[in-house]
Amino acid sequence: VGRTLITSTRYFPKIENCGTSLAQIVTSEPVGPWKDIMQGLVISISSAKKYFYIQTPYFLPTEAVLVAMQTAALSGVDVRLMLPMRADNRLTHLGSCSYLADVLYSGVKVYFYKKGFLHSKLMVSDDELSTVGSTNVDFRSFEHNFEVNAFIYDTETALQMREIFLQDQRDCVQVFLKNWVKRPWYRKAAEIVAVSYTHLTLPTTER
């Protein structure tokens, strides 16, 4: 094992074109000067004119992403957020729930997927842009983990992604603000404790 840079075509054969869609591969890492995927997401949300749909297993957004979602919804954009009803990590799920009132107040539509665990990381906007990859909508993915996403600028792909979202939405229950604010005080307290704890302990290996 050495530090020789391997560039031989034996290991990296030439890639042939296999389609016409324009895709931008974006990476993020904790040691870089920019949070590229988060910045791409913020720009995408802020640029949406009609709709922006998000599927993510964990929702612990940075302030920039949260404000972008709220601003878009307040501007009349149909912003939808889909989360699993039951997550694989209860603490993280409680932390995610602590942010829901913030987005519901601004008009974001929130859905809990009830047909198993939702692990999709999909975002689609205006039948023009979609992005998929390893990134969760959480601060660890944006700021601390090594992640990669494809931003795809193609109508056909966006329509397919939109249809996937809408099909999954049929297996969801919608969360309404008037009901959400009535959850018990001890549940709200648990969410506050959970979100504080996850900011300190959410494992960087969580995917």
Enumerate the language-model features and the residues they cover.
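Charged, low-complexity intrinsically disordered terminal segments
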Residues: 1-200
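Single conserved hydrophobic/aromatic residue that forms the stacking wall/gate
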Residues: 199-207
